[in-house]
Amino acid sequence: MIRRPPRSTPKPSSAASDVYKRQTPYDQRGSSFSDASLRPLSPILSELRLIKNEDEINYLKKACEITVEGHKVAMQYAQKNMFEYQIEAEMEKTFYDLGAERLGYPSIVASGDNACILHYSTNREKVDNSGLVLIDAGAEYNMYSSDVTRTFPINGKFSAPQKDVYQEVLKAQTLGINSVNTKNTMSDIHKLAVSSISQSLVDLGLVPMGVDETISMMHYFEFFMHGTGHWLGLDVHDAGSVEENNKPRKLMPGMVTTVEPGIYILSLIHI
């Protein structure tokens, strides 16, 4: 057997050695930038994400289509004495069956008073046999998220007071959707929704004062405690400022926003 001599480590050429010796140690390289002006890229990237192109709009539409089907399945599947997580599982299975890659955010399946807890995601309670179920869930398609919230009666039929409240929320949402145009800002849409919800609270007898005071004293906030909408895109609450030059920015073609007012009433009020 012939043994080969062990390979020796090649010696660097004198030129390479000189270059190596002249290299600045890593921990000293930043010193030459001490006078540089550094600015974050996030404002620029946020602006790029704010206006969606045609492909992005199509991805969002597909995500919404998948989400709508999942919500429909959940409504049909839900029965009394089920647990919230059972409804959640059936809905999310539908998302994935239809091509969703992941969830846009943790699904909310909230029955009874759980629906009054913003961002409730425990989903462990048994559904009240005569109550309502709120589902706030969205599938993600090609990295773009949807966001859909719906409320329905577990027994398949709204009571008269429940129907009245539902119609008032729908009225506010329709007003908001119809106001999504280049004449308005996100703030304008929220003010319209607040005005509509406040009038509804007065009409339903949920506040003991008139509309103007309900708004000025923010009495509506007990029943509608969040914004009306937010940008939608790669994130469910997508990047991009609602202001431009310290003023509310007008909506532009390519922007995508949700419109989701609500009236949240605890069971002790007997609605």
Where in the sequence are the language-model features?
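Active-site neighborhoods and metal-handling regions in enzymes and metal-associated proteins
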Residues: S17-I269
